[in-house]
Structures are given as structure tokens and as C-alpha cells.
Amino acid sequence: MSGHSKWHNIQGRKNAQDAKRGKIFQKISREIYMVAKSGGPDPDGNPQLRLIMDKARAANMPKDNIKRAIDKATGTGGADYEEITYEGYGPAGVAILVHALTDNRNRTASAVRADFNRNGGNLGETGSVSFMFDRKGYIAIAREDLEVDEDQMFEDVIEAGGEDLQTSDEVFEIYTDPKAFADVRDELQKKYDLATAELTMVPQNTVPVPADKVEQLQRLIDRLEDEDDVSEVYTSADFPED
């Protein structure tokens, strides 16, 4: 683990994501639809659906939206989506992974390539940067009003099955094996309010972003996240603190 705080980058994107909440709901609905269609509509028998429903609730997505996406998946017909990952580099040599759900791979590839080209990036071949990331479970617990020291939190994390704990003045950040994520989350949830809990891609090393590249890189990330077919964007960027 690189030791870099993922929380810092999450908070840096929060306001922009709040402004795009409708589009976020649309993307999560597509994820729910695809997973429910392939693995069944019952979250008890479909762990992947359960995780995405948790993601929907964390985004404050209305229950009716979740139900509509599941109901749509149980009907006949409907679009067939496939998962595709695009890999490339952004300004300052930052590695970027783009996960997409699409029913038209040519449309999506063209849009993603254009975003890279127009914003100082370069779309690479499959495998060009994915080896720089590890799949992990990620849990954040805000420290505000929390009367727990690092030693106690470390003990609780290890007991729950977590792999790593990183601490700052603002937050405890826990990383898990992806297969153990749900169990660790459920165990920690018994004692703490979780600010964030998700499966993610964690860079093995981060790239400090120079001040003169911040705006261009952020614009590239924003453009990619704005694409209807793009579900997640992961980077190795270490943005400077404001």
C-alpha cells in the first residue's frame, strides 16, 4: 500500500459529484440492471447486486429508483450491457483506469479516446496501466466526535479481518481483501458509522500532480466521469492540498 490517503481525493471530488447526482443515479441504475439481469434480482442470492445496492444507498438514491432497475431486469428484452476497462495516462503521467458498462463498445471507445486526446492524455492498450492497481475493499470512518484512538481502531480492524489501517486527523481508512470486504464492512458497521464503503482500485504508487497540471487533469477526469457509459474512473493522482 502506498500510504497515500484516498480520502483526500474522494473529498476533493464530492462537490462535483453532488452537482451531477442525477447522472450518478442513472449510472448506478444501469449497474443494478446488468447485475440483476445476469445474477438474479434477489440480493440475498446475488452478492454483487447487494454491493451495488449498498452503493446506491450510500449515494442517497431513492428506493423507488433501485426497485425500478431491478424490476426492469426481470422483464423480457432490454439492452445487453458489457463491462469494458480502458487504460491510459493523463497529464503529469498519471495512470488512469476507466470502467464502463456499454451496449455499444464502438461508441464508448470513441468517446473515451476523444476525452483523453482533448485533455492532455493518451489512451493506451489493454494491460498498459492495470498492473499498477490492486483491487481492494475500502472503508472510511470519520474521526470527528469519535472517541477511539488508533490502537483501538487497529485492533478492531484486524479482528474484523481487515488488511491495513491508515490514519489521519480526519479519518481512519481501512483496506481489505476484496473477498473479505462485505464481512469486514458488516463487522465494523456494528460499532461505527461508515462514511464510505466500496470496492475500488487502489494504485500501488501515486504520482504527485504539479500545480500547473491540476486543472487539466481534473478536467480529463470530469469529462470521463460525465460519459453516460462510464461507471468508475480510478487514477494514481496525488493532488496537492488546497
Swiss-Prot record:
InterPro entries, per the entry: Integrase-like_N, TACO1_YebC-like_2nd/3rd_dom, TACO1_YebC_N, Transcrip_reg_TACO1-like, Transcrip_reg_TACO1-like_dom3, YebC-like
Any Pfam family: TACO1_YebC_N
Main location: cytoplasm
Subcellular location(s) of the protein: Cytoplasm
Residue ranges, annotated region (Disordered): 1-21
SS bonds (residue pairs): none
Top-level taxon: Bacteria
Swiss-Prot/TrEMBL GO biological process terms: regulation of DNA-templated transcription
Keyword set, alphabetical order: Cytoplasm, DNA-binding, Transcription, Transcription regulation
An example molecular function term from Gene Ontology annotations: DNA binding
GO cellular component: cytosol
NCBIfam families: PRK00110.1, PRK12378.1, YebC/PmpR family DNA-binding transcriptional regulator
Similarity comment: family membership: Belongs to the TACO1 family.
The protein, known as: Probable transcriptional regulatory protein LSL_0422
Organism, as annotated: Ligilactobacillus salivarius (strain UCC118)
